[in-house]
């Protein structure tokens, strides 16, 4: 019981104005000593935007499409989560020590909190953005099952918090826009979750080109097949069922829940949708990013 008392529902902590899970905020100090390498590859997303999906795609690419090699460890061990920290589990920095080059790394950090070494080394970044409505709904369910977050409250109150950036990692609007801006000056492949759902093979080809690798077409098809939502949901190396229940309670909501575009329509009321759209138009004014909220 000690572990549960220690981990359950701590309030968010603000770092440079960004709200973070308490343990992740504590990890930022040690993270400053992190040294990036030019052959590192960073996977960056706002939470609930397809991070695990693109991580598995990239690990399969790095392993030449060998599924057995991708079963060597859970995804969070194969692709260290830089700012991860929780009692009784190896931190992202600790996992990193045992990761051979070339390394795949994962973060949800906004640019203000990103270790400068990643930018100095011009580390390539694969960024995935997902439409805000589906992110908000998915995040609400994730808050329920991942007990390192505060209580999510009602859907209506959570949506309000999401709109003003008072959820872990702060504003979705700022996150997607600042990484989009960075793509003009830094090697960033900016992908959209909805494009990946619509045509995964096309998007995987983009990733291959970006990382300077090639695979035979039948291997690419194999990667598409084994990184489908259906396959990843039942794969213990990708579905987070190996994480202790004190941290993630899959009986509340599975980590891999629906993995679709447009599911927000089952949750948003008409009034919530109208309010969200008006606020969205204001926050995204002048931004050239365009999202599809359904397929």
Curated annotation (Swiss-Prot):
| Known catalytic reactions | a phenol + 3'-phosphoadenylyl sulfate = an aryl sulfate + adenosine 3',5'-bisphosphate + H(+); 17beta-estradiol + 3'-phosphoadenylyl sulfate = 17beta-estradiol 3-sulfate + adenosine 3',5'-bisphosphate + H(+); 4-ethylphenol + 3'-phosphoadenylyl sulfate = 4-ethylphenyl sulfate + adenosine 3',5'-bisphosphate + H(+); 4-nitrophenol + 3'-phosphoadenylyl sulfate = 4-nitrophenyl sulfate + adenosine 3',5'-bisphosphate
Q: What is its EC number?
A: 2.8.2.1
Question: In the record, what lineage is assigned to the organism producing the protein?
Answer: Eukaryota, Metazoa, Chordata, Craniata, Vertebrata
Q: Per the UniProt entry, what species is this protein from, by scientific name?
A: Homo sapiens (Human)
Q: Where does 3'-phosphoadenylyl sulfate bind?
A: 48-53, 130, 138, 193, 227-232, 255-259
Q: Which Gene3D superfamilies match?
A: P-loop containing nucleotide triphosphate hydrolases
**Broadest EC class assigned to this enzyme:** transferase
Which domain of life does the UniProt lineage start with?
Eukaryota
Q: Which residues form the active site?
A: 108 (proton acceptor)
Provide the protein name. Answer: Sulfotransferase 1A1
């Amino acid at each position: 019981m000690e572990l549960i008392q220690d981990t359950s529902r701590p309030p968010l902590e603000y770092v440079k104005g960004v709200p973070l899970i308490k343990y992740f905020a504590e990890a930022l100090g040690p993270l400053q000593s992190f040294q990036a390498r030019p052959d590192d590859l960073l996977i960056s997303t706002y939470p609930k935007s397809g991070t695990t999906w693109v991580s598995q795609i990239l690990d399969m690419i790095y392993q030449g499409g060998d599924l057995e090699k991708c079963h060597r460890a859970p995804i969070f061990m194969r692709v260290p989560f830089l700012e991860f920290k929780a009692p009784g589990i190896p931190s992202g920095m600790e996992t990193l020590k045992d990761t051979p080059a070339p390394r795949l790394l994962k973060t949800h950090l906004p640019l203000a909190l990103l270790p400068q070494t990643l930018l100095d080394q011009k580390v390539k970044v694969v960024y995935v953005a997902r439409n805000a409505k589906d992110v908000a709904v998915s995040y609400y369910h994730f808050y329920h099952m991942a007990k390192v977050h505060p209580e999510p409250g009602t859907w209506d109150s959570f949506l309000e918090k999401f709109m003003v950036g008072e959820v872990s990692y702060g504003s979705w609007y700022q996150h997607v826009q600042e990484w989009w801006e960075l793509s003009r000056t830094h090697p960033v492949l900016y992908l959209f979750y909805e494009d990946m759902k619509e045509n995964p093979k096309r998007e995987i080809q983009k990733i291959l080109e970006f990382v300077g690798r090639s695979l035979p077409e039948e291997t690419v098809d194999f990667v598409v097949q084994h990184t489908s939502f259906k396959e990843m949901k039942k794969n213990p190396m990708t579905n987070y069922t190996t994480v202790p229940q004190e941290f993630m309670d899959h009986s509340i909501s599975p980590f891999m829940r629906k993995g679709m575009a447009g599911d927000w329509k089952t949750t948003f009321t008409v009034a919530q949708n109208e309010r969200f759209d008006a606020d969205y138009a204001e926050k995204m004014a002048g931004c050239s990013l365009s999202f599809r909220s359904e397929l």
